[in-house]
A protein has these predicted regions:
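Short beta-strand/loop motif that positions the catalytic acidic residue
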Residues: 216, 222-224
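Acidic catalytic loop of the alpha/beta-hydrolase fold
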Residues: 226-231
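Flexible "cap/lid" loop of the alpha/beta hydrolase fold
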Residues: 118-123, 128-159
């Protein structure tokens, strides 16, 4: 059996350097761009791409950030330390959308992808039909100490990262899905997870700014798993309370990786959100036509 997922590469310039970025897609309709978690890749969204209830109405896309999955790092990577920044992340998303000609996509991001969704709502709400942040908050207090131990020669970085992430998966996750989620972390490149956490832990702090998000310009949905102790439900609730019009949902029996740890449970929360977006955005576009 062939799955309906197609994988391709797109060449884009990021930070004035050429990059060859891998992405997968499936479905037809309004574009739904999915952003993976720190240290992982677009495979986390494979279940969305094989769900006919979604792909019958949405063109689902997910790219691997440079250094992640099947996207190679840029030339000269061996001579520099990787640190993801807010500006670089926003540039990456906008450049990908422009390269593929995505007209006002809905963006769904998880963890670091969820946090950057808040930045997109601040910087460029007019570019998107709606924004969905999974496991997202303006700031999360680190539940780990210094990250230098994630990248050192006497430690297997991939196995350490997967072990670190294992506790963030809800106990209700099917064993197969749990281990698939952890496998992606075990495969991560050297220093990549640590570099992503620079954005997640320090540089991407949005406290004092999220109250400027205007949800009348772009609807915002925040969904967080009840078992997530990296971005806790209280973190998300506190962020949502500062954004008038933000829709906050705490997802039962889910952790930090809802789309990959328990796809069937996650779709119960995602499908109504997508349906609401089609209804509200469609009505708005009809009025503006």
């Amino acid at each position: 059996m062939l799955e309906p997922i197609t994988g391709r590469y797109v060449h884009i310039a990021l930070g004035e350097r050429p990059h060859r970025v891998y992405f997968e897609e499936a479905g037809e309709g309004w574009p739904l761009l999915c952003l993976h978690t720190a240290g992982a890749d677009g495979r986390q969204f494979r279940h969305l791409m094989t769900d006919a209830a979604i792909t019958s109405r949405w063109r689902v896309l997910a790219f691997d950030m440079p250094r992640h999955g099947k996207s190679l790092p840029p030339a000269g990577w061996q001579d520099e330390e990787y640190r993801l920044t807010t500006d670089a992340y926003v540039e990456m998303i906008v450049a990908f959308c422009q390269a593929l000609g995505l007209a006002r996509p809905v963006v769904l991001g998880c963890s670091i992808g969820g946090k950057i969704v808040l930045e997109l709502a601040l910087r460029a709400p007019e570019r998107f039909r709606a924004l969905i942040g999974l496991e997202a908050a303006a700031h999360q207090e680190p539940w780990y100490d210094d990250t230098s131990w994630l990248h050192r020669p006497d430690v297997h970085g991939g196995e350490l990262c997967s072990a670190l992430m294992s506790g963030l998966i809800a106990p209700h996750a099917p064993a197969e899905s749990r281990w698939e989620t952890l496998w992606m972390y075990a495969q991560g490149g050297p220093g990549v997870f640590r570099g992503d956490l620079h954005f997640y832990r320090a540089e991407g702090d949005l406290r004092g700014r999220v109250d400027r998000i205007d949800t009348t310009r772009c609807p915002l949905y925040l969904l967080t798993g009840e078992y997530d102790f990296s971005c806790t439900p209280d973190d998300t609730r506190a962020t949502g309370a500062r954004i008038p019009g933000a829709r906050v949902t705490i997802m039962k029996e889910l952790g930090h990786f809802p789309m990959s740890e328990h796809p069937q449970r996650f779709r119960e929360y995602l499908l109504p959100v997508l349906e609401e977006i089609r209804g509200t955005a469609g009505a708005s576009e009809a009025r503006d036509a």
